[in-house]
Each structure stands twice: as structure tokens, then as C-alpha cells.
């Protein structure tokens, strides 16, 4: 059993409140909690609520200078996970005042910043968040959204088609642009920089931007269709990233790209604001997501990262394929695809949706099916993802 040191109070005395009625303005979280042997589930759930809000390991005199009742997170419900021994879903409600407006960064620092290394827990996973309109309304959200993108591209009633230029590393800028032209001329709507194409010695970013823009304009002139190439603006500093975005705008291209997890939410939100102000679409790649979301018992489920991206801002986001080389369960994938596209998503535990989510008027994000898919997957992909999606081959 875990020994708690002298002077340490049980969290559940303050932070486990099963009678609490959640407020419409609360941010609600569902955690999958695996306590250490001997730690009661109520204590583990309360520990999560405390450590991700106002609590520390003991009582301090400054607690008397504020109203903990107003500011504390509360574990308001705990249920055992069916088929798992000693594993629980702990529901935590956070008062809205704990969070800075319009900052996904602050939201994550608060909710998942400290608790995951907690001694009383063997493992912890954030399964879902309910973002109230009172909070989501403080975010710009996607620069444009699904409908505006279709209007910009003049493409309706079908999924958009794209492919990633390969070999992803090693081509010169001119040969890279040549491949972009061939793909776009052949009928694709989009081509894509690979997520690790930034500005390497064999192909500096400005040269790539120039030759890709040339390829886009040539293909547009010959096909009479609007074409795009996701120019990856991800860089080592956010200033450099903005410089690359500005260059793309000057070239008049329709869309740029960002790796939002490696680049970070602060940089991503800045870029999304720039994209709205300057009429650029923003394609989001989720490089590094599996580090965070792949373990069943620990980390953060991708549906939370997807919701966070919709708030931070992006017009496309990679969302798994269900059919390709990388794993993804169909119902769960469709659950977060709906969370990306729709205004109102009902709670549905069979699809992994723990809370009803109301986005009110925040624009939607197009899910991108990408990773090991080829033409024989088309029937399955269109059935799974429907019209509002990007099918990204190669």
C-alpha cells in the first residue's frame, strides 16, 4: 500500500463531491484512472481534481485568503471501467475562472500539466473534455472552415483529393515542384509537403515555395480548376514560421500547413489568426500524436487533441484512416471526426464520446484520411468519411 506522510490530508475530503451539480459553464473532463494498489478510487479521482486545480499536498495558510469552493476542481462521479480490474472513469468539473480566455496552452497546462506523474496513480488518461460555449466563444477557431473552403476552391459534393510528394526528403526544389505539377495537372486538388519537410540543406523553404507556386499556377491555367499545395510553414521559431506564412501569402497560394503538436498550440493559434486575416487555408498535421494518444491507459485520447485543434484553429486535420497502414478503430474515429465537423455532437459512449459537445457557431474542420491508403480503399473511405473529407494518398 502507498504510505502517505504525516500532515498530508486526504484529497477526497475536499475534492470528491458526488452531489455536485455541474454548471453549464464548467469545463468537464473524463479521466481513465488506474490507482496504485491500496489507493481508493475516490481518493485517486479527487487527487486528479485537486492537483489540476487549486490543490497542493497540504493545507497552506494562503488557502484562507481565497474561496476554494469557487475555484476548486471537483471529482463529481466515478465509475468502474467494464472488463478492467482496478480502473475507473473519474469525471472532474473545473470552474471556468481557472482558465485564461482563448488559450489552449493554458487549458492543457491546467488540466494535464502536473497530474500525470502523480504517485497515487499507476496510470492516467484524459479521455474527453466538454468545452462549454462560454469558453469556446473566446477562441477564433478554424481560420475558414468547411463551407468557406469549398467556396474558395469551387469544389462541392465530394471529398477533396490529395497526395504527399515522395520521396519526402532528398529532392531538389525544382524537381519537387515538377512532381507537384504532375500530380495537380493529373487531377488532384492538393499536393502536400511531408510533415518533416521544413527547410533542409538540400531544399530551402523559399526555393520550395517558389517552385511549388509555379507548379500550382501552371496546373490551374491548364485545368481551369483551383489547385493547392500544403506549404509547410513549420519552423524552429514562431517568428520564422510567420515569415514563411507571409511569403506564401505574397505568392498568392491558397493553403499552408503546420505541425501543431511539435510546433505547439501557442504557435498554432498565432498562425491560425494570421491565416484568417490573410485569406490562407491552414492544413494541420498531427506529427507526434501517437506519443501522446496511443497507450490505452495513459496519455491523452486523440479526440481531446482534435477538439483542442478546432479551438486553436485549422481547416484540415489528419484523423487516421480506419483502413490504411496506421491503426484506428472505426466507431471511435467516426466519433472524433464528427466532433471536428459538426456543430452539436450527442454523448455516445459506444463511439467514445463522454460528453455532449455544443460548438455553437464555431466553423468545422475537414478530417484528412492519410497514411497507407490507395485507390482500392476508395469505396470504404467514402463510406466512412462521407463528402466532407480530404483523402490524402501516398
Swiss-Prot record:
Protein name: Ribulose bisphosphate carboxylase large chain
A biological process from GO: photorespiration
GO MF annotations in UniProt: magnesium ion binding; monooxygenase activity; ribulose-bisphosphate carboxylase activity
Catalytic activity: 2 (2R)-3-phosphoglycerate + 2 H(+) = D-ribulose 1,5-bisphosphate + CO2 + H2O; D-ribulose 1,5-bisphosphate + O2 = 2-phosphoglycolate + (2R)-3-phosphoglycerate + 2 H(+)
Subunit relationships: Heterohexadecamer of 8 large chains and 8 small chains.
Binding positions (substrate): 114, 164, 168, 286, 318, 370
Alphabetized SUPFAM superfamilies for the sequence: RuBisCo, C-terminal domain, RuBisCO, large subunit, small (N-terminal) domain
Site (Transition state stabilizer): 325
Domain of life: Eukaryota
Organism per entry: Brasenia schreberi (Water shield)
Keywords of the record: Calvin cycle, Carbon dioxide fixation, Chloroplast, Lyase, Magnesium, Metal-binding, Methylation, Monooxygenase, Oxidoreductase, Photorespiration, Photosynthesis, Plastid
One protein family per Pfam: RuBisCO_large_N
Miscellaneous note of the record: The basic functional RuBisCO is composed of a large chain homodimer in a 'head-to-tail' conformation. In form I RuBisCO this homodimer is arranged in a barrel-like tetramer with the small subunits forming a tetrameric 'cap' on each end of the 'barrel'.
Modified residues (N6-carboxylysine): 192
Entry GO CC: chloroplast
Entry EC no(s): 4.1.1.39
Catalytic residue list: 166, 285
Binding site for Mg(2+): 192, 194-195
Lineage: Eukaryota, Viridiplantae, Streptophyta, Embryophyta, Tracheophyta
Keyword Isomerase: no
Cofactor: Mg(2+)
Cofactor annotation comment: Binds 1 Mg(2+) ion per subunit.
Main subcellular localisation: plastid
Location relative to the cell: Plastid, Chloroplast
Amino acid at each position: 500500500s502507498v504510505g502517505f506522510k504525516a500532515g498530508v490530508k486526504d484529497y477526497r475530503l475536499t475534492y470528491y463531491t458526488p452531489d455536485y451539480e455541474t454548471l453549464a459553464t464548467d469545463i468537464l473532463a473524463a479521466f481513465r484512472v488506474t490507482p496504485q494498489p491500496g489507493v481508493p478510487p475516490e481518493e485517486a479521482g479527487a487527487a486528479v481534481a485537486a492537483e489540476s486545480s487549486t490543490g497542493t499536498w497540504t493545507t497552506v495558510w494562503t488557502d484562507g485568503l481565497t474561496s476554494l469552493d469557487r475555484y476548486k476542481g471537483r471529482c463529481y462521479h466515478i465509475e468502474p471501467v467494464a472488463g478492467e480490474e482496478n480502473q475507473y472513469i473519474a469525471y472532474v468539473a473545473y470552474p471556468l475562472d481557472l482558465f485564461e480566455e482563448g488559450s489552449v496552452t493554458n487549458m492543457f497546462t491546467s488540466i494535464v500539466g502536473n497530474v500525470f506523474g502523480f504517485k497515487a496513480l499507476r496510470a492516467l488518461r484524459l479521455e474527453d473534455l466538454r468545452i462549454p460555449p462560454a469558453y469556446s466563444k473566446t477562441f477564433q477557431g478554424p481560420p475558414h472552415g468547411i463551407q468557406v473552403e469549398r467556396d474558395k476552391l469551387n469544389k462541392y459534393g465530394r471529398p477533396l483529393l490529395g497526395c504527399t510528394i515522395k520521396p519526402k526528403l532528398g529532392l531538389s526544389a525544382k524537381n519537387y515542384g515538377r512532381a507537384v505539377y504532375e500530380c495537380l495537372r493529373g487531377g488532384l486538388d492538393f499536393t502536400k509537403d511531408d510533415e518533416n519537410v521544413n527547410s533542409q540543406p538540400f531544399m530551402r523553404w523559399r526555393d520550395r515555395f517558389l517552385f511549388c507556386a509555379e507548379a500550382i499556377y501552371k496546373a490551374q491555367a491548364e485545368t481551369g480548376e483551383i489547385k493547392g499545395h500544403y506549404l509547410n510553414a513549420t519552423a524552429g521559431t514562431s517568428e520564422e514560421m510567420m515569415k514563411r506564412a507571409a511569403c506564401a501569402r505574397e505568392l498568392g497560394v491558397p493553403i499552408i500547413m503546420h505541425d501543431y503538436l511539435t510546433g505547439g498550440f501557442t504557435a498554432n493559434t498565432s498562425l491560425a489568426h494570421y491565416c484568417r486575416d490573410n485569406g490562407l487555408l491552414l492544413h494541420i498535421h498531427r506529427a507526434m500524436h501517437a506519443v501522446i494518444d496511443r497507450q490505452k491507459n495513459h496519455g491523452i485520447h486523440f479526440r481531446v487533441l482534435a477538439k483542442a485543434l478546432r479551438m486553436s484553429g485549422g481547416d484540415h486535420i489528419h484523423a487516421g484512416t480506419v483502413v490504411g497502414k496506421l491503426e484506428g478503430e472505426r466507431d471511435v474515429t467516426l466519433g472524433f471526426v464528427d466532433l471536428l465537423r459538426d456543430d452539436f455532437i450527442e454523448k455516445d459512449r459506444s463511439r467514445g464520446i463522454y460528453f455532449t459537445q455544443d460548438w455553437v457557431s464555431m466553423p468545422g474542420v475537414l478530417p484528412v484520411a492519410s497514411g497507407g491508403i490507395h485507390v482500392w480503399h476508395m469505396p470504404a473511405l467514402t463510406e466512412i468519411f462521407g463528402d466532407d473529407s480530404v483523402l490524402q494518398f501516398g
